[in-house]
Amino acid sequence: MKYDEKAKQKEIYYKEQQERITLYLKYNTKKPNTIKSVHFTSLEQEPMGDAVIEGYINNNKEDEFVAFASSEDNFQFQGDMIESKKVSNLIKYQTKTPDEIKKDLDKKKER
C-alpha cells in the first residue's frame, strides 16, 4: 500500500515538472512556435533529493536537455537547465521562470 502511494506521488510530481519544463521551453524561445514538442526520457533523484529530468525537443534526440529541480527551489523546476547547442540557440538570453510565466499568462486572461 505504501509503495503504491509513493509511486503515485512520484508520478504526480513528475507530471507537474514536465508541465513546468514544457512551459519554460516553449515560452522562452527567441521565435514563437520553434519548439513544437517536448519529450521526456528520464527522471532521477539524486542522493540529496534533487530531481534530474532529461528529455529532448521536436522529435530530435540530439536536441536534448537536462533540467534540475533542487531543494533550494522547493524541488520545483525554476529554469536550471543544461541544453544542447541547438536548444540553447532557440532559447532567449534572459528567460522567465515557470512561476513568472504563469503570472504573465494569468494577467493576459484577466484582460
Regions found by a protein language model. Name each.
Residues M1-M48:
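N-terminal export/targeting and maturation segments
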Residues N33-F40, G55, D73-F75, E100-R111:
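Generic hydrophobic segment detector
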Residues I82-R111:
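C-terminal partner/receptor-binding element of secreted or periplasmic proteins
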Residues L25-N33, T41, F65-A67, D80, ...:
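Homeobox/homeodomain signature
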Residues E62-K85:
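A short, surface-exposed beta-strand/turn
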Residues N33-A69:
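Exposed beta-strand-loop-beta-strand "reactive/processing" segments of non-cytosolic proteins
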Residues N28, N33, N58-N60, N74, ...:
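Detector for Asparagine
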Residues K8, Q18-E19, T29, S70, ...:
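Short linear sequence elements within intrinsically disordered, low-complexity coil regions
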